[in-house]
């Protein structure tokens, strides 16, 4: 630990403060990257689309709100993901939010080499044609605005068009390599 004097002119509490010594910095390699982000909790959604060759969908933890006006979101999808060709060709998509008890749906849509829309998945189509998960407590329909190749992923930006909520729900999270739920502090 180091002791540092605070500048009374810029601090509301003049005096001394104890701050930790500088941490050892390391180069970020793939293992470090994975380790750091395993500790970053993220919401879990299933993104679905259809470009005319049948439904495709995948589990995502990369959904980000980007803009309020216009309402934009973004998400990342691997360049090798089986759903990428459909997402790349689709003009629109659905973001299916999952509740805390729906980790089996999240796992199914994260599994490679299976028909994710086969039983026991319950799904239907919106009147606009996109596949939507019948058990999702809420969803957003988005119109694809941009696609960018970034590293080993593609970033997709979608303008949100419609929203429906079947019920209020506690979100499903992903943290430290497993599904989790919120535990409010207060």
Describe the residue ranges of each PLM region.
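Basic, polyanion-binding surface patches
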Residues: 2-186
């Amino acid at each position: 630990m180091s002791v540092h004097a605070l500048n009374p002119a810029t601090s509301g509490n003049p005096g001394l403060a104890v701050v930790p010594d500088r941490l050892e910095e390391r180069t970020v390699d793939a293992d470090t990257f994975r380790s750091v982000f395993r500790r970053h909790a993220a919401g879990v959604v299933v993104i679905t689309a259809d470009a005319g060759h049948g439904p495709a969908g995948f589990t995502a933890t990369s959904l980000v709100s980007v803009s309020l006006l216009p309402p934009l979101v973004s998400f990342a999808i691997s360049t090798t993901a089986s759903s990428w060709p459909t997402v790349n060709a689709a003009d629109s998509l659905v973001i299916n939010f999952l509740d805390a008890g729906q980790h089996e749906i999240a796992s199914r849509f994260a599994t490679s080499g299976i028909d994710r829309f086969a039983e026991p998945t319950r799904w239907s189509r919106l009147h606009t044609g996109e596949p939507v998960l019948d058990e999702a407590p809420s969803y957003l329909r988005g119109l694809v605005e941009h696609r960018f190749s970034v590293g080993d992923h593609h970033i997709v930006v979608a303008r949100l068009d419609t929203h429906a909520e079947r019920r209020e729900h506690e979100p499903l999270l992903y943290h430290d390599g497993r599904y989790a739920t919120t535990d409010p502090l207060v």
